[in-house]
Amino acid sequence: MVILVGGTNGLMALKVAKISGLPLCYSHVDRYPDGEKYFRFASNIDGEDVVIFNSMHPNPDEIIFETLLIAETAYSNGARSVTCVFPYFAYARSLDTVKGEALPIKTVVKVLKAAGVKKIITVDFHLQENVFGVEHVDLTGMEKLAEYCLEEFSDSFTVLAPDEKAAFWAEKFAAKANCDVVALRKIRIDAENVIIDDLRTGVEGDVVIVDDIVSTGGTVCQAARIAKRAGARRVFVACTHAILARDAMMRILESGIEDIVSTDTILSPVSHVSVADVIASALS
């Protein structure tokens, strides 16, 4: 088995290779003057199980195409199998659509299967189910995030899930931290705006808002204000994937949130927790 580093989050791929002891597969990636992508394996992969390592942020469309190009080329050069590690997997917002609306995850799944991908490894996949039609291993960063929060934020807190879906991850986090969980109910208005119901019970002491993704920050900011109104002393945020789109970081800090931490599935200023060892264990 060899690891091929894609166009994003090469640092984590290098960590995984070092921890697992798996060799790196070298390649040459370039771009023609007209914008077309060039790819070539610089290592012999004949008979190898190739692990393509790519995180789908930023520019998920670019990463998806690059992954397809690499997978196809791997088989053309004698690879025995192709596994894709996507620490962050984009286009997984929902399986629900209205008439005339695209369902991108369906298209992404089709093209990955067509390219011969045999196994997909993700971390805290948003849809919480296997939609790929191939072997899917979904890992979690919640236990490591809980450990970090206990050491760096507070030794006692209540976990707050900002919506019903986030309760799935909040429960994992709370199990490790040995603390209570409270879940809010959210109604999404559009891509950036949500309405969240108030807490029906008060909270005391510190609160950690737990979710898989923080993108614009709208959800966690509203949840933080609700927690404060309910009696929280300090509010922190822990997430697996910190996209932090546009002015999200400023919005979060201005909302009264003390601090935010994420894993390194997406590199950001708050990526203080590494899940490289979790991924390395899944590859061993």
UniProtKB/Swiss-Prot annotation:
GO MF annotation list: ATP binding; kinase activity; magnesium ion binding; ribose phosphate diphosphokinase activity
Residue numbers binding ATP: 34-36
Keywords: ATP-binding, Cytoplasm, Kinase, Magnesium, Metal-binding, Nucleotide biosynthesis, Nucleotide-binding, Transferase
Location within or outside the cell: Cytoplasm
Entry binding sites for Mg(2+) 2: 163
Pfam families: Pribosyl_synth (PF14572), Pribosyltran_N (PF13793)
Matching Gene3D superfamilies: 3.40.50.2020
Root EC class: transferase
Functional description taken from the UniProt entry: Involved in the biosynthesis of the central metabolite phospho-alpha-D-ribosyl-1-pyrophosphate (PRPP) via the transfer of pyrophosphoryl group from ATP to 1-hydroxyl of ribose-5-phosphate (Rib-5-P).
Family: Belongs to the ribose-phosphate pyrophosphokinase family. Class III (archaeal) subfamily.
Record's protein name: Ribose-phosphate pyrophosphokinase 1
Taxonomic source organism: Archaeoglobus fulgidus (strain ATCC 49558 / DSM 4304 / JCM 9628 / NBRC 100126 / VC-16)
